[in-house]
A protein has these predicted regions:
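Structured mid-to-C-terminal alpha-helical surface segments
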Residues: 1-164
Length: 164
């Protein structure tokens, strides 16, 4: 079993408390019948990844950030849109990053720089590292993220919103 722990300091998190039933024996529970595990909400992961992409801007070559953002929006009902809206605003405020840079805006020259990085990133992924087929084009990933943001949140400026 592979366990990965990511430690973060200084960020705000509203954890979720999940009850978990423990394994029991024929004589009953080994210890307690249920424990409570605090979990990091997916909306906070999304908000922190999005803030990192915005903050790093054209200095961001971390394809994992784009992969994670795409995966979270691609999974049906993974994110609660209204909660995501609140959490993104909270994380951006806490990290002193403006939401005015949403949706993601990259010029074609930067997309041309990202594309080979994205291609190599996708090639190096094992099948266990992705549960969703990833687009071949980084532009498609960015467009999907932007589309989700404009359709599901109030984070984009009114001129960026798509008509309903």
């Amino acid at each position: 079993t592979h366990i990965q722990i990511d430690l973060g300091f200084g960020d705000i998190v509203e954890s979720i408390d999940y009850p978990m039933d423990l394994t029991s024996t024929s004589k009953g529970p080994l210890f307690e019948s249920t424990i409570h595990v605090r979990s990091y909400p997916k909306e906070f992961i999304f908000a922190e990844k999005l803030e990192t992409v915005i903050y790093r801007g054209m200095g961001n070559t971390r394809m994992k950030d784009f992969h994670d953002l795409y995966s979270l929006i691609a999974l049906e009902s993974c994110l609660n849109p209204s909660y995501t809206d609140q959490v993104v605003a909270m994380v951006f405020t806490h990290r002193q990053t403006s939401t005015e840079n949403l949706p993601l805006k990259f010029d074609s020259d930067f997309i041309d720089i990202l594309q080979p990085l994205w291609r190599d990133y996708r090639r190096d992924l094992s099948s266990s590292q992705t549960s969703i087929p990833l687009p071949e084009s980084i532009q498609e990933v960015i467009s999907s993220i932007n589309s989700w943001l404009t359709q599901n949140t109030n984070l984009c400026s009114p001129q960026e919103k798509k008509p309903e």
